[in-house]
């Protein structure tokens, strides 16, 4: 897992830091306490992604659209199939299990990517080393 260059970002993280990062981001939305807890539970195996370089094609993502502040919700998610950099920003092309295609703008959503099994093992080991 450490030989994979894509995992280098995890060397500075552990499960507690990832959880705190998600909590801080969600707290900024000023959600009711029950919604905040619900989202934290639903995003248990996910990491917040704000950099295009941290996204993985083929990875499963969930997002919270920020366009309408009165309607904040967590999507069911989709598989990231393509990343396009345009004059309008970074566009993420996704496909869900019903084969429906989505295109979302990275800067108009909070994006969370599901951790792979390899990443989970690496984080577990880093947690153990930090104790």
Say what each PLM segment does.
Residues 52-70:
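Short coil-to-beta transition motif at edge beta-strands of beta-rich domains
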């Amino acid at each position: 897992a450490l030989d994979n260059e894509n995992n280098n970002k995890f060397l500075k993280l552990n499960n507690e830091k990832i959880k705190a990062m998600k909590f801080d981001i969600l707290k900024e939305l000023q959600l009711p306490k029950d919604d905040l807890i619900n989202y934290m539970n639903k995003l248990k195996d996910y990491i917040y992604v704000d950099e295009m370089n941290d996204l993985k094609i083929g990875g499963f993502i969930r997002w919270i659209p920020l366009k309408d502040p009165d309607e904040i919700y967590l999507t069911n998610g989709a598989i990231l199939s393509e990343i396009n950099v345009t004059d309008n920003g970074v566009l993420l092309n996704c496909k869900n299990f019903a084969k429906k295609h989505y295109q979302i703008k990275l800067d108009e959503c909070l994006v969370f990517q599901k951790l792979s099994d390899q990443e989970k093992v690496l984080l577990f080991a880093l947690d153990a080393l930090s104790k």
